Amino acid sequence: MTLRNPHLGIDNDELMRRVEALINASKNRYRITVQVANRAKRRRYDDPNDVEEGWMKPIRRAIIEMSDELTEPEIIGDE
């Protein structure tokens, strides 16, 4: 049984499924790990006063965003 904290957005099981999907979709595990870390780092330093989503750690946010881009390519597609 996984306890879900309403401030985390998704539970740990869902987060792990998203991580596995990212790794499986990538040809290189190291590269996808570095990409996620770089996105989290960039997001953290781009807007350090982000109060709206300040309760979510940057690494969790980066995983969620990148997995959404993987499963829903129209998010990043050109219109």
Curated annotation (Swiss-Prot):
InterPro entries assigned: DNA-dir_RNA_pol_omega, Pol_omega/Rpo6/RPB6, RPB6/omega-like_sf
The enzyme's E.C. designation: 2.7.7.6
Biological process, per Gene Ontology: DNA-templated transcription
Record-annotated disulphide pairs: none
GO CC annotations on file: DNA-directed RNA polymerase complex
Catalytic activity entry: RNA(n) + a ribonucleoside 5'-triphosphate = RNA(n+1) + diphosphate
Domain of life: Bacteria
Keyword tags: DNA-directed RNA polymerase, Nucleotidyltransferase, Transcription, Transferase
HAMAP family on file: RNApol_bact_RpoZ (MF_00366)
NCBIfam families assigned: PRK00392.2-5
Biological function: Promotes RNA polymerase assembly. Latches the N- and C-terminal regions of the beta' subunit thereby facilitating its interaction with the beta and alpha subunits.
Quaternary structure annotation from Swiss-Prot or TrEMBL: In cyanobacteria the RNAP catalytic core is composed of 2 alpha, 1 beta, 1 beta', 1 gamma and 1 omega subunit. When a sigma factor is associated with the core the holoenzyme is formed, which can initiate transcription.
Name of the protein: DNA-directed RNA polymerase subunit omega
Biological source species: Synechococcus sp. (strain JA-3-3Ab)
Gene name tied to this protein: rpoZ
